[in-house]
Every structure is written in C-alpha cells, then in structure tokens.
Amino acid sequence: MINVITGRQVDNLQNEIIDQAVKSYYQDKTHDVFIIVPNHIKFTTEVRALSKLSVLTNKKQVAVNKLHILSFSRLAWYFLKDEAIKLPQILDDAASVMLLEQIVKDHQDELKLFQNKNQITSGALRQMYEAILSVRAGNIDLENIDNEKLNEETSYKVHDLQIIYDDFIDRLSEKFATKDEMQLLLNEFLAKSDSLSTMVFYFSDFSHFSLQELTSVRLISKKAKNTTLAFKTKIGKIDSKAEQGDYDYVVQRTIRQLEHFWQNQQLNYQTTEFPLTKTNPSSLLNGVWTKTNGFDESLSKFLQPVKADSRYAEAYFVARTIYQQVALNNYRYQDFLVLAPNLNEYETYLTPILRQNNIPFFNDLQKEMKYHPLVVAVENLQQIFKRGFQTDNVIALMKTQLFIPEWYKSVARYQNDVDLLENFVLAHGIKGELWKKPLKSFVDAEVIALDKSEQEVEELDRLRKYFISILSEFFEDIETEKDPQAGVTIFWNFLIKNRVAKRLEAWRKEANDAGDLQLAQQPEQVWSTLNDLLKDYLLVAKEFSLEQFFDLLISGFSEANFSQIPSTLDAVNISEMGMVQGQGYKQVFIIGATSSNLPQIEKIPGFFSSENLEQLNDGNNASGYLEDQQKINNLDQNYQFGNALSLASDKIYISYPVINTANEQLEPSIFYKQLLRLTQANEFSQHDLPSSAGDLLTFMTNPEASLGYLTYLKGKQEVNVDSILELTEQEIGEVAQNVLEGSNFKNVPENLPPKLAQELYGDRIETSVSQLETYYQNSFEYFLNYGLHLKKRFENELDVIQAGNYYHETFDYLVKKIKEKNLDFADLTDSKLNQLLIEVREELKEKGRYRQLLNDPFNKYLFHKLDQTTSNVAHYWHSNVNKTTFRPQYSELSFGKNQKVTGLSYSWKDENNQKKIVDLRGKMDRVDLAKVNDRVLGEVIDYKSSAKKFDLGLFANGISMQMISYLEVLKKNNKFFAQGKNLDVLGAFYQNITSSLERLSSDKMILSNYQIKDLLKESTKKLMYNGILVADEEILDLIEPGMEKDRATSEIYSSIKRKVNGDISWPRNQSFTPDQLELLLAYNSYLIKNAGSEILSGKIKLDPYTYGQQSSLTYSDFKDIFFFDAMLKENNYHKIKAIDKKTLLNLIKEKLDLDGDE
C-alpha cells in the first residue's frame, strides 16, 4: 500500500512518520521498518525514534535490529553489504577529475571546446565531471539527442561530452566507480529484488529527490509491503496544477512525478491530509508568509526583527538571548536553532561568543581538512617541487611540527630554533640553492646579532642540514620514478621514516588525554583520508607523475571534511539555511539576512547552462532527462525560507548587520522587509555597545562576558553600575579588577623615573644628529629604538635604505680611489671615470651584505639600475668640475669620539646640579675644499636618493638639524680642514642621486611660446646642489668663477643667478648672512641640549609630528606598539607649520632670549 501524507510547513509530519513507523515495528518485530530521511538529520531522527519506542515499551533503554533510520546513501550500503556482488572501489572526486584530464588530453584533437591546453583547467574539468554524473543519473543517451534542436554552443558541448563520457565510462567499468555508483547499484538491486515485499518504508522531510533517489522511491513504492511518504505543501494539499513560480512548485512537482509513475504502473495509493492543528503563532506566520491568512496582532510578539550594528553585535544578540532564556525562562539549550545563509561569515564571531558565555553548541558546518598540518605539509612539498627551496615553503614545512628531528627533546626548543632559523635566512636572503650552503658562509655580512654567535649558528645549521638532506633525498628518489606503485611507496616511506605517523598519533593521544574527543579524531581521519587518496591515485594513474600526484592529494584534501559528533545532546544547534532541519525547536534565529544572502540565488553555471539543459531535454528522444539543479534551487527559495520560519514554536528572530567587516553598508534582505511589513513587528536595534542603563539588560549574560560592557558604562558618568560591578567582582575578583583598571588606561606613555633613566642612559649619551631628530619626530619612538633597542626583524631586501647605502659607498670608494691614485677629478677622461666606477662596484659587490643581495636575479637588475644612476651623477660632477674650484677632499668622514674630526659636545647641570653631557657623532658624506688666494673654502655634500630641500619649519622643530650640525662641525674643526687658516664655509647641500628625466608632458617643459625646453638640460637641474648657503657674493665668485659674468645663472647651485643690476639673487629661504648663520648654529645647539636634557631626565611623549602630508608615523616600525589614535583625547599630533626665514629668525631670538636686528 502506498500512502501520501500532506501537511503544511508548520505541521510536525516527521513526528507523525516516526509515530507510525515505531508502532508498525512494535506491533510486528518480524518485518523490517525503514525511516528514510535526509542525511543531515539522520542522527536526531534516530534519537527521537528510539525515545518514542522507549516510551511505548516503557523501558529506559531499548535495542532494535529491525527498525532502521537511514539516509539514501546508508540505505544503499545496507542492502548491498550482503549481496553476492563485488562492490567497486569508489573514486574520490579528485581522482575522477584526474582520470578525466587524461581522457581530455587523449582526445584533444577530436574536441571542439578543449583544443587549447589552457582551456583544460581544474574548474572546467570539475564542471564536466558533474555534467557526466548528471547525464548518468538522468539516464541520458547522448547519441539520441536531436542536434537540430540545439544551438551551436550546446551542440559543441554535447559533441565533446559524448566523446569524453564514453571513454570515461569505459575506463570505469568493472574496476572502480564514481561517488554516485552506490545509488545506481541500489536501484539495480531494487529492480531485481524480491525481498522488499515484507518491508515497510517511511519517507520524511523531503521536498525534492535527485533523479536516482526518485527512481529508488518509485521502485520501493512498487515492491514494498507499505510505503508512506510525507510532504509539506503550501496549504497541506496536493495541487496538480502547480506551475513554475508558485510557492510550493518544487514539492508539488515531486508529488506529481510519483503520482504519474503510480498511475502508469496501476498502483493503488491514497492521500491523507494532515488534520489542521489549533491556531498558533507559527501557523499564523506561515499563513501570512504564504499569503493564505491575513495579519494577526500576535505576530508582532512571535517575530522579532533585529537590526544589528555589526556581525559581532548580531552574534552577541543570539548568545545573550539564549543565555537569558535558559537562565530565566526554563529553556534548554537544545530548544534553540541558529541558521545563517552563509555561516562562514560568522566563523570568527558566533562560536567564540557562545564559548565566552559557556553555551554548549553543535556547529554542523563541516570543518575543512585543508588546514590540517599534514595537508599544509603536502602543499609545501608540492611548492618545493615546483619552485625549489623557497624560504616560505621550507619554513612552513618546518612549522607543521611533523618532521621534528630526533635530537630535540621538546617541541618548544624545536620551535624556538625554527624561529631563529627563519630570522637568519630572511636576514641573509637565503632561498633556492642557497639553502644547501652552510650558514657560516653568510655570517660575514653581520646583519643580525646571530652572525656573531658561532655556537647558535652551528645548531641552526644542523637543523637546516637535516631538512635539506631529507627533502633532497626524497625528491631525488621520486622525481624520476615512472611506476605509480613505486612512486606512492617512496612518498609513504618518506612519511613513515620521518615519523609523521608517530607524530599524528602523539597528537591524538594528547587531545584524548585532555578530553577533547573531537580534536582527537582529526589525526586519524586525516591519515585515513591520505590512505584513500593514495589508493585512488593507484587506481587511475597509468604512469607516475609527481605533479599530478600532488595535484590529486591537494584537490582531494580540499574537498575533505572532518566528521563531527555532538559532545552533548543538550546543545544549541548551528546550521545553514537550505539544509533540512528536524522540528521541535522552540526558538529559532535567522542571522545574516542581508540582500546579498537571502534569497540564496545561485548564479554560477555548470558545464551546461540552464538554456543548454532546456534544449537538451527538448531534443532528447528517450525517457531520461537532465535536471537543472540551479534552477530548482532558485525556484524553491520562498518555500525553503518558509520551512525555516516554521521551525519555531515560541519565537522567531531574524537579523541583519548594517555593515560588514570592510565597513561597507549592507541592506536587509527582501524577505526581512516583507516580514517587517506583513507582521508589523517592531524592529529591535542591537548596538555594539550599551549607551545607557536602559540598554544594560540587552548585554548582560555571565560575569566574564558582561564585564566589558559594565566597565564601558562605568566610564559614562550618567550611568551607575557600581552595584552590579560589585557582584561581578565577587564572582571573578582578580579578572574584574584588571579589566576595571584597564578601563582607566590612557594611551599616554609614562616618563621614566630619574633612577631608571640614569640606569638606561647614564649621565652622558653619545648619539647622532639623526637619532636626536627621531626624538623630536616622536620621543616615544626614540625611547623604543635607542633606549630599549627594539628593532623590526631584518630582512635581506634591496630596499630604499640598502639602495641609499650603496649610493653612499659607491661615491665614498670613488672619491677615495681618486685620492689614492693621486688623480685630479678635472683631468679624468670619461672612459677613465667609467673604469674607476667599475673597480668600485666590483669591490663593493664582494662585500657580504651586497653579495647576498646579488643572489637574487631581480636584485642584479636593480643593482644595474643603481649603477646607471651613480654613473649619471658621477658624470654630472665630472662635467661641472672645471666650473668650480671645489674638489672632493673627504668622503664618509666620521666625526666624534676617537675620530680625527672632533664631534659636538654639550654639557649642562640638571635640577639636582648633576652634570649631563651629550656627545654628537656622525659621518659626513663628502667634504669639498678649495684653496683660493690664500683662503680655504669649504662645503658639505649630503647624498639623498630623493629630492630634498632645507625646510625651515622642520629645522625650527628639531626635525632637520643635520645640515646645520655639519656646518658647526666644519667651523669647530677649522684646524683640521684649513691647517690653521680660517675656513670660510659656503654651505651644506643635498645632492639628489637620480637618473630620472623630466616628463615631456610636464608644465615645466613648455615655454610661453609653446616650444619644448631642452630635455637633458631641464633634467640636469635635478642634480644641482640644494640646501643651506651663506649669502656671500665674494665667496661665491671664488667658488664658481662663471658667476662673475653679467646675468649669469649658477650651473652648480640651485636658484642662484646674477640680476640685471649686478646683484646676486639668492634663494629666499635657504640663504643666510654670516650673522644669521651664527643664530642658526646657536639655535641648533639649543635644540641638541634640550633633546639631551629631556632624554636623560626620562621624558617620553607620544607626539608624532605632521607636516602637510608628512607624518612620522608613515614609515614607523612601531605603530603596533604606539596604538596612536587621533580620535582619542590624549593622542594628538604635533602639527608643524611652514615658516619663512624672517619668522624663523624671530623665533630663534625669542627662544634664545636675544634682542637686536638680524
């Protein structure tokens, strides 16, 4: 007998089915009773069935052997396990796709869509694989398709698929099978079997069957003693006229397909409409949603729409509501269901918040296996095979902790050495073949502290050698192997020999001992999956290919998931929309109801588009057909959402966040808007933080989770939460105290106590100008950098700093080589200069830190470009050498303690009358001298890799003291530079090291008559000296004789020219009279002493400067320590304004308390 029970979505048809099945079993235990449900709810259905049987038999514990609760896949295994047929080896999807790839390549010349190798992508192959399964499941004979009814695109697809399909099925036959094979075998068994006549079947919670499942149902209903099916429709009735677009079209279509079969087979069947239950809020909401009932006031209490500030607020609303309902209203955790269209969006919010509130839950979103260390190890082995010993892959392999050498007695010690080794290889640019070199061959670069620790380097080298040895041996053995069995054996032995299996077993035992059964299962499951993948590979591989072997493993693992078991029955269930759910929940949360998530419309086509499938079914002359799963899903969205709304007996919550993690505005789903309109429910706003005492209850759960919100409210003077905080402190005293103290935290660094400052710095600091400039840029950064000596991890990169060093050293070596060979720069020919530059570069590139940079081919190219730049600048000097009397005299000239050139020293007494000293040391890139008419003239040149000017605003604030300090060093070392004579200083200048040309499209290149200026001449201007100079016409004429001419323009110094009246036009804010220069020098001394005084007294401020678009935070390595936030009251930028020369000089006089004219 065939029975069809129809009810509405709110009717508990599953309960009716279980009742009937249990009674049938109880009344006659000689026949088998089957309850067939979707796999997703098999476990809960089994629990409910056994519970009913327990009540019926009045026994606490029951054992059954003829009552079966199964899914379709388990039903296949049940019937086939005792059959005298050889069950095929089921191929993993990855192995099937690999087999498909072989077939496509074998037939490539015959195909129309895959004529190019680039078209054979993993995505295209997977789409074709799913199409093959669909053709097989739909019993389609591609040869019977009428091509006249197909367009060109569909015709090409059918042509290619037929060739590939035939070969694919041929290779499968009698050897192995795809994932759908068991369903096909089940139907073959059911078609032949005579054993069903004594069996009773019940089907529940289906609205749609796959083609093979539908075949199973038809065969079972034809042969079984009794078959009962329950379906939920819009109004609890069968509608034979349902059309596409109707609310319950998909389920009505399923019923129609079955009725059509029964009628054709002349089978008797009866339909029963589930009796209407008394009206309740759930049925009222269903009536409103399906538009079968009108508005009812009670709905506004049954449905609660929630507008949340963020996904975090949304997740917290769920946790808080569950916590309070369990605590106050006698709910159990198992009474709650949380649904989301996309649970991945809530992965970092929902489960951590539930754990924080000690709420047990079961998340049935399967955990992917691809993040397990074993899978990570396989991925990095593949990358090492493809790319060689790239550092990121080798280190990642080490960090899996699967290949720990035997000499390590603790994992912590091993991990520490891996971290140190990572620091070492990054600092020295070790990658590729360099991994095979001993570490001691890199230490001469002396770029990190480890370079000076011979013993530590030896220990790390042992670790390096171990890994490179086992990997080299493994790849050497496996790369040339052609036999699949031998290749897999090499891989297996590699894992076993290196104790990977033992490591996994240790993890299993560790998790098991800790009581984490879920985690304890993972090592075993991932190892078992690896075994299955290896077997699959051996089934399909004709010849061993390491590339294909790794592809199969990684593809297989990417599809694999860890099986999950609920740790307790009383737990909140978390699931995704669209998955069948059991009934019996009291409250249901639908979260993430945004316009992009609901309805869940699928848009990505498979191998066949909806249009292709329609043509194929029209052109099919046989009985089979291809089902458009995407179209069915999209047509079923309203119905599926109605199912979710029908799951709760007491209350439904539907929520959406107004912003996502990228702070982008989100709109509510059309479903959310419809419910809001249909129920007239009041929308509740869940904020990230409470704003008043009235909001407090919407954030209160357990002491730990509520503490942060209470602390936040305590900071609001208008809210009194002291009494609640006292209760909280009684529960979690120390934690509460720490959080409360933290709430008073101000992001302001404290000054060092005098004693600590004394211990850290002493009474005397030896520092450089650039370090003191850091103090004025942000004194907290100075403390971290030069007080605590914190440094970011050094990486061997040819960055701006390294490039600058290379520029400096190139010119240093060049100047010294010219002096060493007693050459005059003016007498050099271009070829001789080039030869000297070649010699310089060869010497430099033998130095450790440059040598290791040159191991990278791209760096070689960059060095070539740097060399072009230095050549450009050197030749510019050479072309101007006869235009000036200056000659480079000193290069990279150090000054300070124990140097020939005395540094700057300043002393003062602090408030305790203790003498404090700052000694200034440093290095000048180049000092040029000229002896003219018994006078010695001098200038300082500072190399910069980008254009720079002497900025008065930055100097006034202590951020640009370098050039003035250099001038002071020149003046204080008069004897050294002028051998007892007076040294007349012209200035200190920046030399821009560049080879860039001015853009032809630049406004600067267009004359008033629209003619283009000389490109080379305009570009050369970028190389002219620019800085601070003494406005002394006599000195200038001695240095650059060409300036004596009428209306002359300097070819060496930027922005200097002789006016028509014969006077010199000096750059406005970069030129100073000798008296004005003395003021600058005095102010510079004041700045140095002031910085030294504050450093030695322990003063620290978080006061980064801003100047236009510049900020001292832009390139800071310590932003994660600063936590600087300009929105906080206590965090403020030190804003610098541009000033002119007159303002600067007045400021200096004010600061130094001076009077008088300039």
UniProtKB/Swiss-Prot annotation:
Keyword tags: ATP-binding, DNA damage, DNA repair, DNA-binding, Exonuclease, Helicase, Hydrolase, Nuclease, Nucleotide-binding
Family matches, as InterPro entries: ADDB_N, DNA_helicase_suRexB, P-loop_NTPase, PDDEXK_AddAB-type
GO molecular function term, any single one: hydrolase activity, acting on acid anhydrides
Translocase among keywords: no
Subunit-structure text: Heterodimer of AddA and RexB.
Function description: The heterodimer acts as both an ATP-dependent DNA helicase and an ATP-dependent, dual-direction single-stranded exonuclease. Recognizes the chi site generating a DNA molecule suitable for the initiation of homologous recombination. This subunit has 5' -> 3' nuclease activity but not helicase activity.
Name used for this protein in its record: ATP-dependent helicase/deoxyribonuclease subunit B
